[in-house]
Regions:
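Extended alpha-helical scaffolding segments
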Residues: 1-142, 166-178, 182-623
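Residues immediately within or flanking Cys/His clusters that coordinate Zn2+
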Residues: 150-153, 276
């Protein structure tokens, strides 16, 4: 039976997997007290998973602080770890709730203090109140645009609690949002800003059980009295109005303000429970929440220091790439920064905890050109030795080995392109009768259709996990250096796997060309083998910049070919001529004049020229 106000302290709502693999919901108190018997928080949405984890981390910080065990040093952390070794003590939780007078602040439908909401909020937009699916960032929450969106599933009260927390942690910016009021006090936001977890990716460590996971991510920091969570410092309409632009602000003004004032959180506790949205769930008589008032909350300054985010050298959160798995950037995530605040703090913290292994979780979204456009969710897990987290030699080696795989990828792609262009030439050595432009377009389409890179990277992922397990064995601890090359088993195994998977993916991709003489000839001329020299970066001469012609001068017309077009055009002409056994002095002159190269250096202009030519013609074309 669900209680009227649904108290998150007492009512079960947190989805967890226990050590016996049974799934069960817990309330806040029972989840923390029984954290030793819970394997992990688990939800189908990774955003919900890490949002609830951050919510519980903020709660644990406050419990430790209220019980005179503030996590201001690693020594205090050791003390907390010893006292909570069998689960977070319920007496500590009760002490915190009583001393901070927040026992009644965890109810979803409380009249005075609804958790994570603005009491008595009324949004006045024409679409307000919205369907409760508005809390689901990945689901329909407004006017349906697709056939399958006509009947969205409304959340239960438990689901509403989960998505209320995740919507505060994760949300995109928009130029428009609803006006709101509480009583006669009006709030006129100019638009919604990004929620704390939207930019970059969230990284957290996972232990053997929920308690270990919490303690691994409860890093020590100088906690201050004003670093308060949302349940101790309720969001009010007055605070929202104070963050509006001050120009022409009146209580009953209907004019939209130009811009809201953004602010920094006072610490991790406030950041983990940041009220980025002003929300109020409408009370329900059943077990389903139907409507919600939803508008902009407190604006957050760009790039606040988040202890669960990795940052680049310029201080910006690292984004997930739509074209790359997170494992390909693991060395950048683990990279030790000179500024400690720019690194995921749990890494150095875990290295001091005495554990042998841990699991790194990376979750976030890959976004499109438009900031609010999500291409897909990503959630990846890596089991790594704890010693690796602060070993700069191993981290650098991971970056080097992944970089070698990137080098092979470039050659792999070029081989596929070369095969596609050779395939467009008839087996008798004469070009097709169709127009040159059409033939080039056909080659481009073939190259795209046989692209072997997706299969290449997908197969390398398994080998990368093996590399993480075994790479520390390549390091000689006594000598303080890497073992001799012939004894670096993990490194040699990885490099062999890279070359084998490149060959395998290319051979499988070109099978779609068939077994005609044309296909066999194209594949044989280019080859599908890879060698160790392909692991190294390919030399590339610096290319001169294309000079823009001034209006009225020769060559300054609209049809002037770009540098890249000249290069591609010449290579295609050269390929067809080489098949016929002819030379083309005109093409050679065009290339030299167009690229500004000295005679005799044509091979450096484009590294793929010479492989197209039979041996007996190379000296002719390179004169």
């Amino acid at each position: 039976m669900i209680e009227k106000d649904f108290d998150l302290l007492k009512n079960d709502w947190i989805p967890c997997i226990q050590l016996d693999n049974e799934q069960r919901d817990f309330c806040i108190i029972s989840a923390l007290v029984n954290s030793c018997s819970i394997r992990a928080i688990h939800h189908e949405s990774p955003v919900v998973t890490f949002s609830v984890l951050r919510f519980l981390l903020a709660f644990c910080y406050r419990v430790a602080y209220a019980t005179k065990k503030p996590l201001t040093s690693f020594r205090n952390w050791r003390r907390v770890h010893e006292e909570w070794k069998n689960g977070i003590a319920q007496k500590d939780i009760e002490t915190y709730l009583d001393e901070c007078k927040c026992r009644d602040r965890f109810r979803l439908f409380d009249d005075r203090y609804p958790l994570y909401q603005v009491a008595n909020l009324v949004c006045t937009g024409k679409e307000q109140p919205e369907p409760a699916t508005r809390l689901f960032f990945e689901q329909f929450g407004g006017t349906p645009t697709q056939l399958w969106e006509h009947a969205p599933m409304l959340p239960t009260i438990k689901e509403a609690a989960l998505y209320l927390i995740s919507s505060q942690a994760f949300g995109a910016s928009t130029s428009n949002t609803s006006k709101a009021k509480v009583g006669e006090i009006h709030y006129l936001p100019s638009g919604r800003t990004f929620a704390p977890c939207y930019k970059g990716c969230i990284v957290w460590l996972e232990g053997a059980n929920l308690l270990e996971t919490l303690l691994l991510n409860l890093v020590d920091y100088d906690m201050v009295d004003v670093d308060l969570p949302i349940w101790e410092k309720q969001l009010t309409i007055q605070e929202l109005r104070a963050r509006q632009a001050l120009c022409k602000q009146e209580v009953n003004s209907e004019k939209k303000e130009e811009k809201c004032h953004k602010t920094f959180p006072t610490g991790p506790v406030q950041l983990f429970t940041w009220p980025s949205r002003a929300i109020l769930l409408e009370k329900t008589k059943g077990e389903v929440v139907e409507r919600v008032h939803f508008t902009q909350g407190l604006g957050l300054m760009d790039y606040p220091l988040d202890p669960m985010k990795p940052y680049d050298a310029e201080g910006r959160p690292m984004e997930l790439d739509k074209n790359k798995g997170a494992w390909r950037d693991l060395h950048a995530i683990l990279e030790l920064k000179p500024n400690r605040n720019r690194t995921v703090l749990a890494f150095s913290h875990a290295a001091r905890c005495g554990l042998s292994r841990t699991i790194i979780n990376v979750a976030g979204v890959a976004r499109g050109a438009k900031a609010a456009k999500i291409l897909f969710w990503r959630y990846e897990r890596f089991s790594v030795p704890v010693a690796m987290l602060e070993d700069v030699n191993i981290i650098d080696r991971i970056g080097t080995l992944v970089g070698e795989a990137d080098n092979v990828e470039k050659i792999l792609r070029q081989k596929a392109i070369n095969i596609a262009y050779r395939y467009t030439v008839q087996a008798n050595g004469r070009p097709d009768t169709k127009d040159q432009h059409d033939r080039n377009n056909d080659a481009d389409k073939i190259a795209e259709s046989i692209d072997p890179r997706p299969a290449y990277w997908a197969r390398l992922e398994k080998h990368f996990f093996d590399l993480l397990q075994n790479l520390p064995n390549d390091w000689d601890t006594e000598a303080g250096d890497w073992k001799p090359d012939d004894q670096q088993h993990a490194t040699r195994t990885w490099r062999k796997a890279v070359l084998n998977e490149a060959r395998r993916s290319l051979e499988e991709s070109v099978r779609s060309l068939g077994t005609t003489a044309r296909a066999i000839s194209a594949i044989a001329r280019v080859g599908t083998d890879f060698s160790e020299k392909d692991l190294k970066p390919q030399p590339q001469d610096s290319q001169p910049k294309e000079k823009k012609s001034k209006p009225g001068k020769k060559g300054g017309g609209k049809n002037q070919m770009s540098l890249d077009e000249k290069r591609k055009s010449f290579i295609r002409r050269l390929l067809s001529l080489a098949e016929e056994g002819k030379e083309d002095r005109g093409a050679l002159a065009d290339l030299r004049s167009g690229l500004g190269k000295e005679p005799g250096k044509m091979a450096r202009v484009h590294k793929h020229v010479v492989p197209y030519l039979p041996e007996k013609y190379r000296t002719v074309f390179l004169r």
